[in-house]
Amino acid sequence: MTDTPRICDYEGSDYRTDFWEGQGRNYEDRVERGVLRHILPESGKRLLELGAGFGRLTREYDNYDHVVLLDYSFSQLQYARQQLGDERFTYVAADAYHLPFKPAVFDGATMIRVIHHFEDVPRVLTAIRNVMTDDSTFILEHANKRNIKAMTRHALGQQGWNPHTLNPVEFVELNFNFHPRYIQGALHEAGFDLHRQIPVSFLRSGLLKRTLPAGFLAGIDSILQETRWLISPSIFTLNTANGDTDESNIDLPRDAIFASPHTGSDLQRDGDFLVDDAGTRWEIRDGIYDFKAPAE
């Protein structure tokens, strides 16, 4: 197996309750849901939700027949499964650098509030492109290095890093901000066509959120999004996977979409395990396909 960059692991964390529920982020949640509803395709067959976590946004993808929730945290996926069930959803614990899927098995993918934890952006975007069909939709959100607060602090000499340079900045371990043009270039190199950049969360201020209703702030934000000023703390991008290979495995049944994250070879079901041709096994436990490490 090739060397893996550092991975941010939320295993066992209280991310849901420490960051979202009851933590004053209803405004951000509404804004993100609103953008997804605006730019998602009307329908689709199979969507990959990268960094799905506890399933906060998963119900926004009800227009897809099948949704695969992927996260590195097994415990986050356990909670998501308890809430969502199994009828339309598949749960996969894996790292996004080594996706355990065959090529071209998804006609949609999203990565929201996730890529800021990745130190090798080109590598993970290439991995995502490899499992998507041509002309499929990829929605990527990223933290914006060139936001108005960072630019102001830099101009006043209160910040050590320059928001105008293209290179990512790691302001806390495994927390990166990205220049919009850096992301644009990385998407292009990975095989995506960028169609739109949508700045969001212009009003991410503790004072405003304590003073004004979340719905009102989200409404103002939707107006500001139309300015396309890329100075907000967060930016959504709408992309399609380019290419003319006509390769598609989109109609494969659920179990048949998987491949070895080590070699890419086919996997066979053997009870509660998926097994490759070398005998390496990955376990299915608590209804979750566990590709974090081979089974003992």
Language-model segments: residues:
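Conserved class I S-adenosyl-L-methionine
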Residues: M1-S43, R56, Q76-Y79, I139-N162, K292-A293
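N-terminal, positively charged/glycine-rich alpha-helical extensions of SAM-dependent methyltransferases
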Residues: M1-T17, D266-E296
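Class I SAM-dependent methyltransferase SAM/SAH-binding core
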Residues: L48, A52-H98
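A conserved beta-strand element that flanks and buttresses the S-adenosyl-L-methionine
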Residues: T110
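A short glycine-rich, Lys/Arg-flanked "PGG" loop and its adjoining helix->strand segment in the class I
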Residues: P122-T137
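A C-terminal cap/extension of S-adenosyl-L-methionine-dependent methyltransferases
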Residues: R153, G157-G160, Y182-G185, E189, ...
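Acceptor-substrate binding/catalytic loop of class I
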Residues: W161-Y182
